[in-house]
Design a protein with these regions (language model features):
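N-terminal periplasmic accessory domains that precede
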Residues: 110-112, 154-156, 196-199, 213, ...
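Short, acidic Ser/Thr/Gly-rich low-complexity loop/linker segments typical of extracellular
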Residues: 53-69
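Outer-membrane beta-barrel signature, preferentially recognizing the C-terminal barrel domain
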Residues: 490-496, 567-615, 620, 640-652, ...
Length: 819
């Protein structure tokens, strides 16, 4: 605790020093102005130079902002020229201008640039970015102009991302490892894996600008997420005015689907207002088959269960915010986001029970009716100060989030043998109302120590309270009423406080970039099972170092090396010790004694001409949190829980190659080969180890038919793999899409076909020799969609600032989500 207090005091001292250094020298002045294009609209990112009037030597340099304005501060008294340069336009010189004690601030008249025809003849301006870009610390998937963006959901697009795989429940893995932290515009999603899958299924691909895959995050990020961070950046709308877009789409697989929404952005000199709403209706079919053999010394029982499920779900996502520009250096903002998800489902279940395959001595006919509602709201208040032109910045975020969930499942079970009903129907219900509250705040500070060296520092705190009130009800046929079963009901309250601080130092040499960081996180938690009168407390302090090194070997060759240590804390709901019934013979329960898992990751990367990118990685995770499926031979049931397996070692090789084959055909291919090995000294009362060499492959082919029409074909293949006690069969699919623009790209129509050949399904068996089961799931993956989008207003409006709020680590741990 003493070390942590010293670290916090050091950071606060640095922030105080920044405010002192921000004082303006009274012996200097400032020169400012604005640049316009040929249409007299603001010209962003023009190169502006400040020259000495005597010898024309450069004194300072800058770029115009999105509103076309620029400013040189802390300029010594004297005579100066101003130069303006943009490729494709004639170069402009203005001045001389005299700064003195009588005139220390000079505001120049706006300068209108004139196109240079000679330059334009030799310049090809290409605005569309490649689908995949490799940057120093991340891989960027530019979704905005992809034909498969519209007609696919965010979850569909993630599945096509390099090195990313999504399982049947929507759990996301990166390079063969689970535990990914998902962010939206650098902000937390505040959701469990289940809720997150539901949100991503409801989010339209047309709203996404790009997806960032960060496999080895720096100390600036929360230490949670052993396989890294996926940041989904939504589209933004750079001058004053109003713009937006509306879209509507429909699709059909087994059932009809529909979606619609709009975005709006309005920017003035002092403020920017933005918002978006999208709505989706999705009815889908899902089949689940479970074949299980229960062996004892006395008998052998086979359970052969088939289930057909139809789900209806209505989702709405909304966001509104405002940025207020106090001046050109300071901005304060507020963002409100929310979602509503309402759904119901009906599952018809047939279970054959006997000693011979496909022949049941008895059977259970079941019907499961489910009704659910989930709502969530997050509030973010933020402040950013660009203290000087050298890169000194201060950023502050405060967040509050509240989530409410309610799901009720009703089970009707009828028992038959020899064609006759053998006993009275068994009817029961379970309900899972839950409330999650999150308060968090953080401060980030950047200070340039030298020209090519900077310091980053920050502090953060978060407080989380969850309340899960699980209820189990039996139907009393005598009174014709539902009665609470106190032996199967439970209230579980979980409180957690995490305090963190970090330091990062970045240094650039000739062809070399180095970054060293250290993050400290102190965790205090308490889980309270009210019904069982059981309290589990944990208090611990951890340090998370990170190192990044990149070397340009030559013009076409570069190499990188990185290391980081990370943590994964259990989902809040996974700590709840009480039983949740999936059906009559399958149930799951939490483990209050789950410990966090820790991962040390190493990566070696190589890039050739930024087109062939190779990464070799190794990680070791201790106390791995893994979902296990085990049999209760006495009760002849299958139960699902989470346990800390001893160790996971992961080796992975990733090769990515975006290649333009011709002017009209480009391709991007990504191959990840990985070997995950799990070892435990005791699982199901015996030592256990598993491992398998696996791979996944993604390919995307883009064909430009003409200036307004694109065709895309994409596919993926995930080989057989082992994760913990689960042996997962291969998964694969092929998608295609066609995009056509009209009305100078204001109107767009896209057609998309997901899983064209209806190949996608999931098969899971046990990797434990003592367990014998097969879980097979086929969902409605073959869907054909059509979407129309219309954009209105100016195409150059600067949208909302992207914020990284203060609760990234808490985002994916909220439990009780719906799908």
């Amino acid at each position: 605790m003493k070390k942590f207090t010293i670290l916090l005091s050091t950071l606060l001292g640095i922030c105080s020093l920044a405010l002192v250094n921000a004082q303006t020298n009274i012996n200097t002045g400032a020169i400012s102005g604005k640049v316009l294009d040929e249409k007299r609209e603001a010209f962003p990112y023009a190169t502006i130079g400040l020259l000495n009037a005597k010898d024309s030597l450069a004194i300072q340099g800058t770029l115009t902002k999105e509103n076309g304005q620029y400013e040189f501060k802390d300029v010594s008294m004297g005579s100066y020229l101003v130069s303006i340069y943009v490729v494709g336009y004639k170069k402009v010189f203005k001045g001389p201008y005299e700064l003195n004690s009588a005139k220390s601030k000079i505001q120049l008249e706006a300068v209108q640039l004139v196109p240079d025809a000679k330059q334009l003849q030799g310049v090809d301006i290409v605005k569309q970015k490649p689908l995949v870009e490799r940057q120093l610390d991340k891989t960027v998937l530019n979704v905005e102009n992809s034909t498969l963006a519209v007609g696919n959901t965010a979850l569909d697009i993630l599945e096509k991302s390099p090195g990313v795989s999504v399982d049947k429940d929507g759990n996301i893995s990166l390079r063969g490892k689970q535990g990914v932290t998902i962010m939206l515009d650098g902000k937390p999603t505040y959701l469990s894996s289940e809720q997150l899958a539901n949100l991503l299924r409801s989010m339209e691909g047309s709203a996404i600008k790009s997806i960032e895959l960060i496999t080895n995050p720096s100390a600036k990020y929360d230490a949670s997420g052993n396989s890294g961070i996926i940041n989904i950046k939504l589209k933004k709308n750079s001058n004053f005015g109003t713009n937006g877009s509306v879209f509507a789409g429909s699709g059909y697989g087994t059932y009809y689907k529909a979606n619609s929404g709009f975005t709006l952005n309005h920017r003035k000199a002092k403020f920017n207002v933005f918002g978006n709403v999208d709505y989706g209706r999705n009815k889908r079919f899902n089949s689940l088959d479970i074949y299980r053999v229960n062996n004892t010394l006395l008998d052998r029982t086979i359970f052969d269960q088939t289930s057909d499920n139809i789900r209806n779900r209505n989702n709405s996502n909304y966001k509104a915010g405002i940025d207020y520009f106090l001046n050109d250096k300071n901005t304060i903002g507020f963002v409100f986001t929310g979602y509503n998800s309402n759904g119901d489902s009906q599952a018809d279940i047939l279970t054959l029970i006997g000693s011979t395959p496909a022949v049941g001595d008895s059977s259970v006919v079941g019907k499961n009716l489910s009704d659910s509602k989930y709502t969530g709201q997050t509030y973010n208040l933020n402040y950013k100060s660009s203290i000087d032109t050298l890169g000194q910045e201060l950023s502050i975020d405060a967040d509050y989030a509240r989530y409410n969930g309610r799901e009720v499942n009703a089970f009707d079970n009828l028992y038959f043998a020899g064609g006759q009903q053998t006993r009275a129907p068994y009817l029961f219900q379970n309900g899972t109302p839950s409330v999650v509250k999150i308060w968090s705040g953080k401060i980030d500070y950047t200070y340039p120590l030298q020209k090519d060296m900077k310091l980053e520092a920050g502090i953060k705190t978060s407080i989380v309270t969850t309340d899960n009130d699980y209820r189990f009800l039996n139907f009393n046929s005598g009174t014709n009423q539902w009665e609470n079963d106190v032996t199967r009901s439970n209230q579980f309250i979980y409180d957690e406080n995490i305090n963190a601080a970090y330091l990062n130092v970045n240094k650039k040499f000739k062809g070399t970039s180095v970054q060293i960081g250290l993050r400290a996180e102190q965790t205090n938690s308490k889980g309270n099972s009210i019904t069982e009168s059981r309290i589990v407390k944990r208090d611990y302090l951890n340090f998370f170092p990170s190192v990044f090194l990149n070397q340009d070997l030559s013009k076409n060759h570069s190499m990188g090396l990185s290391y980081s240590r990370r943590i994964d804390r259990p989902d809040y709901g996974s700590l709840n010790p009480f039983i949740y019934y999936v059906d009559l013979y399958t149930y799951q329960f939490g483990n209050p004694f789950l410990k966090p898992q820790y991962t040390n990751s190493f990566e070696l990367s190589y890039s050739f001409k930024k087109t062939l990118n190779t990464t070799l990685g190794y990680s070791r995770t201790s106390d791995v949190i893994t979902e296990v499926l085990l049999s209760d031979t006495a009760k002849k049931t299958l139960f699902i829980s989470n346990e800390n397996l001893a160790t996971q070692k992961s080796y992975n090789l990733n090769i990515s190659s975006p290649l333009p084959i011709t002017k009209w055909w480009s391709t991007n291919n990504n191959l990840t080969v990985y070997y995950n090995r799990f070892e435990s000294p005791s699982l199901a009362n015996a030592p256990y180890e598993s491992g398998r060499l696996s791979f996944n492959f993604n390919t995307n082919q883009t064909i430009t038919l003409n200036s307004t029409t694109n065709f895309e074909l994409s596919g993926y293949y995930v080989s057989k793999q082992v994760y913990g006690t689960l042996l997962i069969d291969p998964m694969y699919a092929i998608d295609m899409g066609l995009s056509k623009n009209f009305m100078d790209k204001k109107l767009n129509i896209k057609l998309a076909a997901n899983d064209v050949f209806n190949l996608r399904e999931s098969k899971i068996t046990s990797a434990l020799p003592s367990q014998n089961y097969l879980v097979k799931q086929k969902w409605e993956s073959q869907v054909f969609r059509a979407t129309i989008t219309y954009r209105f207003g100016s195409n150059n409006i600067k949208g909302a600032r992207e914020r990284s709020s203060s609760a990234d680590a808490e985002a994916k741990r909220v439990k009780s989500g719906a799908q």
